[in-house]
UniProtKB/Swiss-Prot annotation:
Molecular function in Gene Ontology: 1,4-alpha-glucan branching enzyme activity; cation binding; hydrolase activity, hydrolyzing O-glycosyl compounds
Cellular component terms per the entry's GO annotation: cytosol
Entry's family note: Belongs to the glycosyl hydrolase 13 family. GlgB subfamily.
SUPFAM superfamilies referenced in this protein's UniProt entry, alphabetically: (Trans)glycosidases, E set domains, Glycosyl hydrolase domain
Protein name: 1,4-alpha-glucan branching enzyme GlgB
Residues of the active site: D416, E469
Pathway in which the depicted protein is active: Glycan biosynthesis; glycogen biosynthesis
Gene Ontology biological process terms from the UniProt entry: glycogen biosynthetic process
Gene3D superfamilies for this protein: Glycosidases, Golgi alpha-mannosidase II, Immunoglobulins
Quaternary structure and partners: Monomer.
């Protein structure tokens, strides 16, 4: 005679299910037609329940009670005379309570064949729409669709608040062909905590955070969080339309790099982060008043270690909890756009950390990383390198980039550590790396990925800016992909940065012997579309602040810094400056503390801040400073060889009819009276800016706001003038308004 168990569970399926070894649970649990086709059978597994009834969702009536097959929690039963499947819920009685749930095992697969194909191919741009935790409506029932990629796992369950973290309750459906696991759970609340519980090929169990989670717990906790259903209502249409038609390589771009956790803090002891609403009220007006065109946010994907500054993210899709939720971040970006400020996001695609709840050996195998440490481990940071040749990994990264640009309206990505992606021998000794298929050192898979990424993003999101932090001489970083380039819009000019900061640190007496450090960058300025960056990396790890790098007394330090900024803003290329540098922060940056805003009580710091503000105003108002940034016609040296005086003079040109600007940079404390410079034409030239003005806390030497050029050729120009060059200064001269009008006529 058959027992209850083998009436409903054949071939030992009940034992396998109880032991967590039955992977095809959807073929067993839920509603199924009997073998003879004459009845419906419902099976479920509910620990600690003692009675289960099946209730029709359509009319709310009880259809049948299920038999308790064993004390472990297996229930099963037939649905009377019904032979047509119907939607149902389970009324479950526990010793002290009764609940009703919609049985998740009655639903079929929800994954789309096209999505699966693109994901495996490596070209899925919206993988976050079907992977992770997404709200879905299935046959009129609302719930959360969980999906994860784990092709080598023997079993995957979703565990969380909603099932008491029981790995046997919600075993997921496996798609053998592509390694995806899914389940639709109607009985989950927004804000619920969850993880994926995986049985590895060796039989070990590990709980992992959702790689596609859009919200995560605060460290040291690491559960993923079911997202809210509410959506942000965008109000940035004007900006998005303007962005789409803006040629940024011809437009002014002055980027303010920000670490949100330390720009400013609140609380009695500065122990609290500003939230997004605080940042809307404080950061945006400040950036606007200072004249910056963009904000660049250091990484905001969830990261457990504060000291990584976000460059070792574990939750690549989850905005960090530190400043608020996803809707708060969207509101911040929206407010920036309404203030006519763009927002660029630092994006980390070069490596990921080894935190055990993260991507490392996700399903018990090297899924996201390479198996061989010679390709899969980063020696500098002890992190793991993505396997860029694997389609699913490419889709994971491509979709993440699209996620930030599409869902959060970011205006571009600054990709961190591109150099480490491009070379297989990056930071490795001989014997520690594997050559490519042609015997070379280039990482062909990473190069292919970056080309694909840039091509697709520029096509999908008009007007964005893709920026590379790339420190080598790799050719074609900003060349179009159809010309065999990487396809970036801009590349950080690390050579200019290193040379110019080295020059800055030298005593003025010896700068004459290092004159080339400020002129050499113009030898290669047009080989890429460069961005001049003085980033956070230059004011940490014992390097000191910019002010600290400069020798001399305080007066010389401040004057030199103002002159340096003048040179930077006059030099071809877009601009990026790290927060605090705009008012000459004295101490190097500390991510644990706010910037030293109290310094603005002192005039020298006010002077530097005002100088940057006026430089930005001139930069945005004079097209000669941006429209021909990447064409040799936009720049001309007047004298690049005056090393003995450490004076640099050059002209910036715009399009026909645009007024040129003349820059005079003096990097010694000497004053030069009767100093002749060439000028584009005879007539009146305004002294637009003078960094030595009393307005900037200088010594107030100069030309009283006006220079008159005579018809005396000089330095290849048809006219010239005798001027006073103040100490450690930057002068910017431009045609007076009447001269500009005359020239246009």
């Amino acid at each position: 005679m058959m027992t209850q168990a083998n009436t409903y569970f054949y071939n030992g399926a009940d034992v396998a299910l109880l032991n967590g070894q039955y992977t095809d649970v959807f073929s067993l649990l839920g509603m199924h037609t009997s073998e003879d086709g004459k009845s419906l059978i419902v099976r479920c597994f509910l620990r600690n329940a003692f009675k289960v009834d099946v209730i029709s969702i359509k009319d709310g009536r009880r259809v049948a009670g299920l038999e308790k097959v064993n004390d472990a929690g297996l229930f099963a039963g037939t649905m009377g005379r019904r032979v047509k499947p119907f939607l149902y819920l389970l009324r479950i009685q526990y010793p002290l309570s009764q609940i009703e749930i919609v049985d998740p095992y009655q639903f079929g697969p929800l994954l789309n064949a096209d999505d699966l194909y693109l994901f495996g191919e490596g070209s899925a741009e919206r993988a976050y729409k079907f992977l992770g935790a997404n709200w879905r409506d299935v046959e009129g029932i609302e719930g959360v669709h969980f999906c994860v990629w784990a092709p080598n796992a023997k079993r995957v369950s979703v565990v969380g608040d909603f099932n008491h973290w029981d790995d046997t309750q919600h075993v997921m459906r496996q798609h053998m062909a592509n390694g995806l696991w899914e389940i639709f759970l109607p009985n989950v609340a927004e804000g619920a905590h969850y993880k994926f519980d995986l049985v590895h090929p060796n039989g070990e169990r590990h709980a992992k955070s959702d790689p596609m989670a859009t919200q995560m717990e605060c460290a040291p906790h690491n559960a993923s969080i079911v997202p809210k259903k509410s959506k942000h209502s965008w109000k940035d249409t004007l900006w998005m339309n303007k962005r789409a038609v803006t040629a940024w390589h011809k437009a002014p771009m002055a980027i303010y790099e920000v670490h949100l956790g330390s720009w400013r803090r609140k609380g009695d002891n500065g122990e609290q982060y500003l939230d997004y609403q605080d940042l809307i009220e404080q950061l945006i007006p400040y950036v606007k008043a200072q004249g910056f065109t963009h904000i660049e946010l250091m990484p905001i994907s969830e990261y457990p270690f504060d000291g990584s500054w976000g460059y070792q993210p574990v939750g690549l899709y989850a905005p960090t909890h530190r400043f608020g939720d996803a809707n708060g971040l969207k509101a911040f970006v929206d407010a920036c756009h309404q203030a006519d400020i763009g927002v660029v996001l630092d994006w980390v695609a070069a490596h990921f950390p080894k935190d055990p709840h993260g991507l490392v050996r996700f399903d018990g195998t090297c899924l996201y990383e390479h198996e061989d440490p010679r390709k899969g481990t980063h020696p500098d940071w002890d992190t793991l390198i993505y396997n860029y040749g694997r389609g699913e990994v490419r889709s994971f990264l491509l979709s993440n980039a699209c996620y930030w640009l599409r869902e959060f309206h970011f205006d571009g990505l600054r990709i961190d550590a591109v150099s480490s992606m491009l070379y297989l021998d990056y930071s490795r000794e001989p014997g520690q790396w594997l050559p490519n298929a042609y015997g070379g050192r280039e990482n062909l898979e990473a190069i292919s990925f970056l080309q694909m990424l840039n091509q697709r993003l520029y096509q999908a999101f008009p007007g964005i800016c893709m920026i590379a932090e790339e420190s080598t001489a790799f050719a074609g970083v900003t060349k179009p992909t159809d010309h065999h380039g990487l396809g970036f819009g801009f590349k950080w000019n690390m050579g200019w940065m290193n040379d110019s900061l080295s020059y800055l640190s030298r005593d003025p007496i010896y700068r004459q012997y290092h004159h080339h450090q400020l002129t050499f960058s113009l030898m290669y300025a047009y080989t890429e579309q460069f961005m001049l960056s003085v980033s956070h990396d230059e004011v940490v790890h014992g390097k000191g602040s910019l002010l600290h790098k400069i020798p001399g007394d305080d007066w010389q330090k401040f004057a030199t810094l103002r002159a340096y900024y003048g040179f930077m803003w006059g030099h071809p290329g877009k601009k990026l400056l790290f927060m605090g540098s705009e008012f000459a922060q004295r101490d190097e940056w500390d991510h644990n503390h706010s910037l030293d805003w109290h310094l603005l009580a002192f005039e020298p710091h006010q002077g530097v801040q005002r100088w940057l503000k006026d430089l930005n105003q001139l930069y945005q108002g004079m097209s000669a400073l941006s429209v021909l940034d990447y064409q040799p016609a936009g720049f001309r040296w007047l004298d690049c060889d005056n090393g003995s005086a450490s004076i640099f003079t050059f002209v910036r040109y715009g399009l026909a009819g645009d007024a040129p600007l003349v820059f005079v940079i003096n990097m010694t404390p000497s004053v030069h009276h009767g100093f002749r410079i060439g000028l584009p034409q005879a007539g009146d030239f305004c002294e637009y800016l003078n960094s030595d003005s009393y307005l900037y806390c200088g010594s107030n030497q100069g030309n009283a706001g006006l220079v008159v050029a005579q018809n005396q050729p000089w330095q290849g120009m048809e006219s010239s003038a005798l001027i006073t060059v103040p100490p450690l200064s930057c002068l910017v001269l431009g045609l007076a308004a009447n001269q500009v009008e005359a020239k246009r006529r």
